[in-house]
């Protein structure tokens, strides 16, 4: 029998909000450090771990997370409670990028969320709490692959709706995804493959192996997220310098595609796919080819924000223009819910960077200048709740 879910875990929401400027994140971390020491509860340790992960204090955060998981593995997130449907989120222990923080999208609305951190050593033996539907929130990683394989068998005949089945999540691994989308209509995703370090070291000293992509190309470590370890290689000298700084034994390699617009700026779009429909999440505009919303200058540039606001207003037109591509993405991925990072190429195709069920969708930036984002992401939030309720009605 499963232990009762632990109350008091706040999820990522308050810590992400503070990290975006609506609060004092270091003060929150100090508060939870004090409470963990005084109360010694699973929730206090997990809140401390989440705050420390947001601050980038990874080793200390993982130590706090282990303290929490030694006390409890299932936590209730803030929400409506009562008769609201109970959605059990299966999550991986580890970094924030390991799982989609659904609480940041829903912000306490519509569903009662319970998060269960699976035990990677025994993912099949664990007892799970009562729930109305189950959702796998983890993405693909070296740590998650054996867990997903074990869960595939366990959940095959699960008596409740299962959102994002394990086999579909596995298909989002970068090399697998590029093969999956190779001939998808309206889509461009250059082949991605794992390359052993030894081949790259040979190329760096001038012995370019036959079949190795010529520069420019992109390299990244297999488990990297958020651009960590990602670089563009233009010369053998640059390759040597990169390898000197990266200790990994293999890397993902993919051809670089210049997706700059006529003004020289790069625009990366994040959309969410939900039950075959597509929704806007954000548009980031940057002067650099490696675009992330938090470092693209969106917070201090009203012109960039105006472009994102226009993107939300005209998204229906964008989605209609790329309907065959989005239809192919939904069908081939086979995921109920995920986010996709992409750009629009000069020839009108969607350049796919990644598709990941663990990506975050939110509109938690404070201030009136981001009101358009809160309005723009509301349709996804409302549709997600309706979609889950619809899945439950299908079973009755």
Regions found by a protein language model. Give the residues of each.
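C-terminal active-site "lid" helix and adjoining low-complexity regulatory extension at the edge
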Residues: 331-335, 344-396
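Hydrophobic residue at the +6 position relative to the catalytic HRD Asp in the kinase catalytic loop
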Residues: 340-342
């Amino acid at each position: 029998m499963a232990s009762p879910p632990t109350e008091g875990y706040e999820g990522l929401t308050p810590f992400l909000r503070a990290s975006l400027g609506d609060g004092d994140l270091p003060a929150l971390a100090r508060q939870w450090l004090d409470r963990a020491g005084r109360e010694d509860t699973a929730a206090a340790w997990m809140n401390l771990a989440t705050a420390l992960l947001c601050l980038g204090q990874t080793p200390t955060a993982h130590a706090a997370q282990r303290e929490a998981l030694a006390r409890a593995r299932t936590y209730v997130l803030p929400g409506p409670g009562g008769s609201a449907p109970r959605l059990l989120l299966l999550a991986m222990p580890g970094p924030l990028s390991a799982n989609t923080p659904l609480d940041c999208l829903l912000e306490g609305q519509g569903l009662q969320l319970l998060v269960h951190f699976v035990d990677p050593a025994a993912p099949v033996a664990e007892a799970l709490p009562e729930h109305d539907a189950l959702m796998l929130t983890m993405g693909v990683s070296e740590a998650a692959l054996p867990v997903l394989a074990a869960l595939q068998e366990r959940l095959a005949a699960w008596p409740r709706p299962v959102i994002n089945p394990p086999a579909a999540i596995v298909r989002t691994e970068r090399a697998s995804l590029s093969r999956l989308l190779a001939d998808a209509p309206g889509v461009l995703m250059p082949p991605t493959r794992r390359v052993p370090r030894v081949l790259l070291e040979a190329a760096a000293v001038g012995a370019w192996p036959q079949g190795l992509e010529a520069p420019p190309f992109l390299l990244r470590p297999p488990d990297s997220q958020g651009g960590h370890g990602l670089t563009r290689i233009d010369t053998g000298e640059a390759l040597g310098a990169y390898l000197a700084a990266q200790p990994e034994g293999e890397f993902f390699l993919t051809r670089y595609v210049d997706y700059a617009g006529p003004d020289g700026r790069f625009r990366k779009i994040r959309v969410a796919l939900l039950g075959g429909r597509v929704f806007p999440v954000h548009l980031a505009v940057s002067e650099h080819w490696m675009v992330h919303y938090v470092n693209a200058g969106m917070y201090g540039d009203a012109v960039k924000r105006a472009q994102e606001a226009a993107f939300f207003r005209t998204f229906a037109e964008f989605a209609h223009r790329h309907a065959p591509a989005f239809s192919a993405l939904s069908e081939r991925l086979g995921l109920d819910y995920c986010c996709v990072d992409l750009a629009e190429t000069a020839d009108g195709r969607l350049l796919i960077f990644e598709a990941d069920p663990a990506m975050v969708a939110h509109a938690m930036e404070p201030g009136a200048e981001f009101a358009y984002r809160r309005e723009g992401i509301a349709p996804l939030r409302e549709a997600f709740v309706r979609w889950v309720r619809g899945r439950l009605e299908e079973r009755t």
